[in-house]
UniProtKB/Swiss-Prot annotation:
Amino acid composition bias (Basic and acidic residues), ranges on this chain: 827-841
Organism: Drosophila melanogaster (Fruit fly)
Entry GO terms, CC: DNA polymerase complex
Annotated region described as Disordered, given as residue ranges: 760-780, 805-851
PANTHER family, per the entry: TRANSPOSASE, PUTATIVE-RELATED, TRANSPOSON-ENCODED PROTEIN WITH RIBONUCLEASE H-LIKE AND RETROVIRUS ZINC FINGER-LIKE DOMAINS
Descriptive protein name: Copia protein
MF (Gene Ontology): aspartic-type endopeptidase activity; ATP binding; nucleic acid binding; zinc ion binding
Amino acid sequence: MDKAKRNIKPFDGEKYAIWKFRIRALLAEQDVLKVVDGLMPNEVDDSWKKAERCAKSTIIEYLSDSFLNFATSDITARQILENLDAVYERKSLASQLALRKRLLSLKLSSEMSLLSHFHIFDELISELLAAGAKIEEMDKISHLLITLPSCYDGIITAIETLSEENLTLAFVKNRLLDQEIKIKNDHNDTSKKVMNAIVHNNNNTYKNNLFKNRVTKPKKIFKGNSKYKVKCHHCGREGHIKKDCFHYKRILNNKNKENEKQVQTATSHGIAFMVKEVNNTSVMDNCGFVLDSGASDHLINDESLYTDSVEVVPPLKIAVAKQGEFIYATKRGIVRLRNDHEITLEDVLFCKEAAGNLMSVKRLQEAGMSIEFDKSGVTISKNGLMVVKNSGMLNNVPVINFQAYSINAKHKNNFRLWHERFGHISDGKLLEIKRKNMFSDQSLLNNLELSCEICEPCLNGKQARLPFKQLKDKTHIKRPLFVVHSDVCGPITPVTLDDKNYFVIFVDQFTHYCVTYLIKYKSDVFSMFQDFVAKSEAHFNLKVVYLYIDNGREYLSNEMRQFCVKKGISYHLTVPHTPQLNGVSERMIRTITEKARTMVSGAKLDKSFWGEAVLTATYLINRIPSRALVDSSKTPYEMWHNKKPYLKHLRVFGATVYVHIKNKQGKFDDKSFKSIFVGYEPNGFKLWDAVNEKFIVARDVVVDETNMVNSRAVKFETVFLKDSKESENKNFPNDSRKIIQTEFPNESKECDNIQFLKDSKESENKNFPNDSRKIIQTEFPNESKECDNIQFLKDSKESNKYFLNESKKRKRDDHLNESKGSGNPNESRESETAEHLKEIGIDNPTKNDGIEIINRRSERLKTKPQISYNEEDNSLNKVVLNAHTIFNDVPNSFDEIQYRDDKSSWEEAINTELNAHKINNTWTITKRPENKNIVDSRWVFSVKYNELGNPIRYKARLVARGFTQKYQIDYEETFAPVARISSFRFILSLVIQYNLKVHQMDVKTAFLNGTLKEEIYMRLPQGISCNSDNVCKLNKAIYGLKQAARCWFEVFEQALKECEFVNSSVDRCIYILDKGNINENIYVLLYVDDVVIATGDMTRMNNFKRYLMEKFRMTDLNEIKHFIGIRIEMQEDKIYLSQSAYVKKILSKFNMENCNAVSTPLPSKINYELLNSDEDCNTPCRSLIGCLMYIMLCTRPDLTTAVNILSRYSSKNNSELWQNLKRVLRYLKGTIDMKLIFKKNLAFENKIIGYVDSDWAGSEIDRKSTTGYLFKMFDFNLICWNTKRQNSVAASSTEAEYMALFEAVREALWLKFLLTSINIKLENPIKIYEDNQGCISIANNPSCHKRAKHIDIKYHFAREQVQNNVICLEYIPTENQLADIFTKPLPAARFVELRDKLGLLQDDQSNAE
């Protein structure tokens, strides 16, 4: 059989499953299927080779040319199919979800035959099965029946009555095809009449031109002796139709003149077409328009479609074709419609008697549109772009369905819409609400019908495990407040916009009414309970009797107990670890969180809006029926307030809201601005103004529930508004964290609009105010209980990207306006700002930096300065550990001091420095020698901070400009060691494990103690009055000299050696005075001029400190609290290390202090191509990377992977890099109080243990792997960690793990030598956990494996240490591998799990310990 007869289309990337099925059938026919299904035999004979050639040739024959790269010459037929499978056989969950969505949205249209519909349906089912989905026969039948329109309801009902055992898909299809024939026969027997009357247009020229291209001679439709005979609807004879009937044409010609006169009496733009009878309502609804080529005006029969209209006085009389009949147009206006694109119709007439809507071809052409008729219908286009394509035909007349942008159009009672308005309520609850009379305006729900549509936000927010059997509640409560349940949920990250971490609920068991408060700390529970008891007891005039709670400490405080005793409230505590005993509150919290999570997901808002979602969820839950109530026909709200709630004001969470601006506006200023609906208040909607970053409460609004917010659009960036043109800045005060209530106008008592619950008895939010959210209220005029001015948009063309786009556009417009002229009143203030930016190290303003400097609101400029950072001053070439000094607001020069408010403090610091030099005899003033290099000098200023980040001392340092020194004349050796930060953590680990004391001393002017070997002359410093020919001959070292640090280190080391201290062989800045006992030994760590001393003998400690103070000018800081920017909190058996003050400064510096927190530093999927792009956005990426690296090296190992990955692209400086860096800041925002914990472990098994892992080929750019390892002391204290991209590409995961092991072994040996150097011995080999069995095998086995023969020799160093019993490798499952966090970005749950195991805990967690 040749290729043509087989009818197999060459594969071109489409329908791979069908193509593969046919190819396999062909290979089976050729008896060569075994070569693609079976394994190749050890001995390949000629028959196998022949079958292989045949199979490969067949597959290649049915591949299109563009896909031949899958079939290279050196691969087999089986490998070709495997390569194609890898690309086109999609069996992922995402593929299945996309196909299921298509299947659920599939509907049979009126133009499509049932056989074509079956074909599309079967293709989708086949694709689903190919994607790995399991679909039962009944599922296929159910999906098929769902796709059918209402005309098949009868046969569907009949099918539903059949037994499932007798039902097959083929049987159902057969019955449906029979039904299709019946429907078509019924349709032909009762042909619909579309046009009842024809009115001729008086504009005959237009009509003649319009029909010029039409065939005037009637076509002969039926040829031969056709069995099918047509019949004329006019004369009743067979063989022709009405339009070709000569009797009809004669009557039409006779009445032509009379009809034209009737049109002229009605209007000069007479209606040429009138629909009087339309029976096919499935095609044309209220927003359907018949396209009429003879009409001279548009006409509608529903005035709610108008967006703007005027009365026609007197009414316009319009004659129809039937003699003696007239209709009247009473309005004329504008209608906005949308099909694929928006179209606006002007001068549209409204006639109530019309049975349908008409769209005039003439009016469309006058508006510049072109209309093309073809067999499928009609296409309307403008300027070559398609605007509308008709979606249906009605008796060969084009009918176009639209959605109307009508402010007055009533909302359709859509099941999905009310589902979202009720906060994604369950379908059963919504139907129960419809059945029972629970609301004052219950009629709004009369037309609800159950929808089969799947709600994806509900799945994202609510999907859970199947329930367990519940015990029946046998408690019989007779009144409210008899039993109250309470529980706390949290901490929740990110924090809310007003910095809340928890929420607490109080549930009354009798009414099932819930009150929710947002709180920052668990200790706030008591004040919230007081508020609840006071308000609820006053409401009912009853007492709370029982309080059901768990054993949380927030409920067991002394003040809580005393309050309950005073009020006569009895505690009922649950058994520990048995939350089922407090099931009411546990279930309520679950319901609230699921509903809130779903609303945030559905609204596409940032997670920091969870607090508003929780309050809104509570508000809605109180208005939803509960099975826990004795009377299930009532809601908790009605049980609590004794009256029914209202529905009118319910709106979809996260909807776009247009707020009316009440302040006096310019003639052409906007009268509204956009915001986001986030909740309900007693007198209006609670809204988030994203531009001005504040909550507002308003009632004069328009709500667009179809337009949800995109999370990327809501950026909390400061907007510098212009003075008079940004009116909303006047409406609302500058405090972005307060809720501002707008003023309400007087309203009538009876109003048909939406009711806002102002009465204290109508709103639980009024009864129970959230103390943590103070509401600033202006004075209100008298307001009605049931009134509002809210209007609703059913659809909108606007996109929610406005939150960012409008902000950016406003900033651009302001910037352009300022650049047009020089007479800007803000110029002087801008120049002052520019000077201030220079003072803190920022260059002249440039554009597109993406950074904003926030002043205090009262001092903010009205325009946004475009600033950029000096890349030269903020490069990674600076020492990372000095990154914490970049935030000091200090003078940049000696002359600048004269203009500062703190002038006296700096002058005092300068005098102190000069006196120190005088006492120290640092220099001798002499005449300038000839032929000698003179080193320049300058003043450097800084501020020293305590552990809380508060300034404690102003420091002025006179430094030499070392770059003016000459090599081998002014200096030779310059290197000076400094202690590793891991050495500092090593000392702290010893301190906590062996109960040592650790103190700190600060060396004053440390470098001035160094002795110079060279003869150096320096220019006189500013502040000393002397002969200009004089210079300073340096007697001792001074800051800034290249050799100053080395000179100081040599002097300090010599002083310690005089006391018999010995320094470590692996870290020269660690010294030990060995007394044979760890508690009596003295350990010293030197970090430049900071000295850390640890010992268990305080007498030796004090003696040693006195010795140092005799040798050098020093400050005794006693117990260590703050070291190189790290805050140290000492407790009896724990040490906490944190850098919260520094993190806050970073957030402030980069304008991210009000950002939204995220749960991980980086997303689990990173776009490396965008990170590697050459786009230059002029953002301070390098400066930020340096700051993050300092945090990561000191106390935050959770940042290691993120900083390592992003620093690889620090030279790119593109927008993707900047966005990822800002995400790291957002993560820091949510973990400011994160602490690294060291604690005493009496049951430790290993003094040092390690974990090592690698991410094979994780770098998508160069495919190199990433090494990650960590080491702990005493099984808990984390002292070393590292992430590093490997130098070469690994051929396998085993090789990548082996290369990572090499790096870990080197670090382990360093720790071993460090312990040995301070006389602490290791009894056992250092244990390193590895999760790759192949790597362990290579390290343990000295024989050469095939897969390891190419590995570089240096990596076998790890094997040598294993053989020497220095290192012991032990396998660990991947799920327990702690080093996994150092190899790649992880999902949030896995990341948090490993972060906790590293010993990183936040404040509340550390307190719980």
